[in-house]
Amino acid sequence: MNKKRLLIVDDESGFTRLLKLTLEKTGHYTVLEENDGTAAWLVAREFRPDIIFLDIVMPKIDGGDVARQIRSDPLLSHVPIVFLTAIVSKNETGSDIGGFPFLAKPVSLEALTQCVVEHLGQ
């Protein structure tokens, strides 16, 4: 079976670790976690994820800037980006910065899995 490659970028290491362990336990995904937004673009270039889950609010660089870096990279511009945030109003979307809709934290495994299926068809 060809496992989908997921990159989770969030400065909350406990959150990314929990998502990684939970998703990998299903046997369908290979998950890489990155807690530094400034390293996310380089990590994505090396890992070549099928989808990126990206926190909006991070120290040093925000998720919007990371998304713009990814979108401008010919190797990564096709990769779906799903924004993760605890700060969401019902009228906000991620489309204004080249991404896909937000998932509100705390994110359930069901919501995350459904999002992967919607974007990658698994």
Predicted regions and their residues:
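Active-site residues of response regulator receiver
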Residues: D10, D55
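Conserved Asp/Asn-Gly motif in the active-site loop of CheY-like receiver
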Residues: E34-T38
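Receiver (REC) domain active-site loop signature in two-component systems and cognate sites
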Residues: M58
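C-terminal output helix
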Residues: V107-E118
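Hydrophobic/aromatic residues positioned on beta-strands within the core alpha/beta folds
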Residues: V82-L84
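Two-component/phosphorelay signaling modules centered on CheY-like receiver
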Residues: S13-L32
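Active-site beta3 strand of CheY-like receiver
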Residues: F47-F53
